[in-house]
Curated annotation (Swiss-Prot):
Binds directly to 23S rRNA. The L1 stalk is quite mobile in the ribosome, and is involved in E site tRNA release. HAMAP family: Ribosomal_uL1_B. PANTHER family: 54S RIBOSOMAL PROTEIN L1, MITOCHONDRIAL, LARGE RIBOSOMAL SUBUNIT PROTEIN UL1M. This is Large ribosomal subunit protein uL1. One of its GO terms (biological process) is regulation of translation. Keywords: Repressor, Ribonucleoprotein, Ribosomal protein, RNA-binding, rRNA-binding, Translation regulation, tRNA-binding. The gene is rplA. NCBIfam families: rplA_bact (TIGR01169). Belongs to the universal ribosomal protein uL1 family. GO terms for cellular component: large ribosomal subunit. Disulfide bonds: none annotated. Part of the 50S ribosomal subunit. It comes from the Bacteria.
Length: 236
């Protein structure tokens, strides 16, 4: 049996018309429907015309949000030797090698992002069953397997995000906070759109963009006019 909607959600849904909104209008409505008693995130859900079970239709990459994410990112780094000092100096929240691997193997997940140097990946790979389901496994495509720890930590702390299409071809991403001005949210959303277009899988056939919806964490889903977003030119 379908769960009954709260009066709050029913009222919010009534504000949303069954149309694809212009990007700015959609974001303004998303902000208006962010009425929960906590600071809600701005979410985007994008259905693409890909089938990720095929290797040439998988999408996993990164995007830099020009206005940031609005949240503190806790970065853990697995490295050894002089790279430990480099990571510490760059502002990593947790740094270690065998000691950190052991902590994670025992269930410690007190971080939002895990970066590793290539030489320690054989050891990190043993944590796959713990890290994989949480989307925390370092990967070269995601920019989280690197020797340039200082640059990677700086970028992820500043608003760089790793994202992927799930097994149904949908990208789920938080692109800021609902408290951001519409202009800031639009800049971030445009960056996401451009990243997805730029990284179109080689095996993608037919219509690439299917639907795009935005919502506050506890708000209703609002469809965005994809063509209007892709054609949008922001002032530089």
């Amino acid at each position: 049996m379908a769960r009954k909607l709260s009066k709050r959600m029913q009222a919010l849904r009534e504000k949303v018309k069954p149309i694809a909104y212009a990007p700015e209008a959609a974001l303004a409505l998303m902000k208006e429907t962010a009425t929960a008693k906590f600071e809600e995130a701005a979410e985007v859900h994008i259905r693409l015309g890909i089938d990720p079970k095929y290797a040439d239709q998988q999408l996993r990459t990164t995007v830099v949000l020009p206005r940031g994410t609005g949240q503190e990112i806790r970065v853990a780094v697995i490295a050894r030797g002089e790279k430990v000092v480099e990571a510490q100096n760059a502002g990593a929240d947790r740094v270690g090698y065998e000691d950190l691997i052991e902590e994670i193997s025992k269930g410690m997940m007190d971080f939002d992002l895990l970066i590793a140097t290539p030489d320690v990946m054989p050891q990190v790979a043993k944590l796959g069953r713990l890290l994989g389901p949480r989307g925390l496994m370092p990967s070269p495509k995601g920019g989280t397997v690197t020797m340039d720890l200082a640059q990677a930590i700086k970028e992820f702390k500043a608003g760089k995000l790793e994202y992927r299409a799930d097994r149904t071809g949908i990208v789920h991403l938080i692109f800021g906070k609902c408290k951001f001005p519409v202009e800031a949210l639009l800049e971030n959303l445009k960056a996401v759109q451009e990243s997805i277009d730029r990284n179109r899988p080689s095996g993608a056939k037919g219509k690439y963009w299917r639907t795009l919806h935005v919502s506050a964490t506890m708000g209703p889903s609002i469809e965005v006019d994809i063509n209007a977003l892709r054609e949008l030119k922001l002032a530089t």
